[in-house]
């Protein structure tokens, strides 16, 4: 059994994990009944893991969202989608591997799936550009979404990116324009759109496939206008203040629910989705089927109008006059 990658704040679980592994090896190599001891240790480990993850800070949630063993877009597709057929290319000479898309069925419903895809190791991450799509990736996604609109297929997007690729080649190819066009065109689509933040939801890279009728996110996912490291570097010229930036940015599910940005926060298994990926897949499938059935009951005009209103209401501000009144009181 492959050893799990433990984050720094999970290190108190290392000793328990080692004891559990030793008892399992003993059970394999002998006829001694160790089921009771194994159950006690696993129960204790689960309880401690629950305590640790219940008290995570925003900065620690980012570590969970970036966990190398966290389920990816392709993992979820393999878990609960049937007849998956990947579609390639932006019809302009590129086929960005950081952003994938294709046709599949969820239950009895045919859908279009798009999402960022990270790698499991260095080689895969280089091939996938660490989930950071170039302009061709967003143009590919738009081509596929137009296809879905033409054939009346609901669109399901999986968001998992630190942000759109910011290299020179991306700027030369029109990164900002590609994302902006996606934002505009997604408001015009007449089919249901459901987006789920399965890991990181970073900046314009997430928004490029994130204009949706329903926005879901997992409990330990994050959705942010900029990475805390970038925010700290810009505001305080010190990337070491990323934990403070993470708290200020309001990047977690509960905060985003209060702000009216996220429609549902999906509970994760104890220890995060990487500890029980199949359970996470069941949770996501059930949520997608529920929201999809609700959205399919709406007309194309209702979908577009509601989508526009949802995003129009986002954001809060304070009038300077009311601030002055509060100070004088």
From Swiss-Prot:
One of its GO terms (molecular function) is acetyl-CoA carboxylase activity. Residues 40-294 form the CoA carboxyltransferase C-terminal domain. Its main location: cytoplasm. It catalyses: N(6)-carboxybiotinyl-L-lysyl-[protein] + acetyl-CoA = N(6)-biotinyl-L-lysyl-[protein] + malonyl-CoA. It comes from the Bacteria. GO terms for cellular component: acetyl-CoA carboxylase complex. Keywords: ATP-binding, Cytoplasm, Fatty acid biosynthesis, Fatty acid metabolism, Lipid biosynthesis, Lipid metabolism, Nucleotide-binding, Transferase. Pathway: Lipid metabolism; malonyl-CoA biosynthesis; malonyl-CoA from acetyl-CoA: step 1/1. Its EC number is 2.1.3.15. Gene3D superfamilies: 2-enoyl-CoA Hydratase, Chain A, domain 1. It is found in: Cytoplasm. One of its GO terms (biological process) is malonyl-CoA biosynthetic process. Belongs to the AccA family. Acetyl-CoA carboxylase is a heterohexamer composed of biotin carboxyl carrier protein (AccB), biotin carboxylase (AccC) and two subunits each of ACCase subunit alpha (AccA) and ACCase subunit beta (AccD). Component of the acetyl coenzyme A carboxylase (ACC) complex. First, biotin carboxylase catalyzes the carboxylation of biotin on its carrier protein (BCCP) and then the CO(2) group is transferred by the carboxyltransferase to acetyl-CoA to form malonyl-CoA. This is Acetyl-coenzyme A carboxylase carboxyl transferase subunit alpha. It comes from Prochlorococcus marinus (strain NATL1A).
